[in-house]
Amino acid sequence: MKKMERRKFLQVIGAAALMGAAVFLTGCDESSPVPGPEQDKGDGSVSLASLEAFSGHLNWNNGVEPEDVSGNSYSRAANYMVCVFSNGAEWDFLKSYTSDGYGYGFAEYRVSGKYKKLTMKLAPHKLMNKDGNAYIKVYADDKLVATSEFVKKKSSVIDFEANIAGAEYIKLEVYIHAGSCIGEGSDGNDGALIMADAKLWP
């Protein structure tokens, strides 16, 4: 290889390496992993996952594959959460039972009157039993403002919306039916929920 050709070759290799490093650091590659809560969708909304809860805890982007019963993935949503009442650190936000047999978790966020509504998508996770179900509630300044319909194994994706206009703080409650086993079965009734694209709108 001639001297000039070698120099050009090394310049090309160096540029390619820098481009690869930039993709790795910025996450701009189309095949990059799940986007974090800081992702800017350019629609004026704020990811709920970017707020720090002052009470309670919900485990956003908890590393569990957010695939629904139809095989659709929500891993490229602004945020996501998979909720199953089972063993494992990824489920530790569902610490309590309700009297009617639901695993329960919640988080409260200070929103300081900045937002008019909270929206998200609800879908049955692939671990949802055939008789399982799940639902959520939203409170604004301790007043119940929205309750979702039950999410069941054969449910379509639900576009959920809660009016939180003027609220200083909001509370999101998650209820997952806690049955006897995960998976198909005649008595299977465990719930398994995907919450995705939880956004606050000014």
Please name every model-derived segment.
Residues 19-23:
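Hydrophobic h-region of N-terminal signal peptides that target proteins for export
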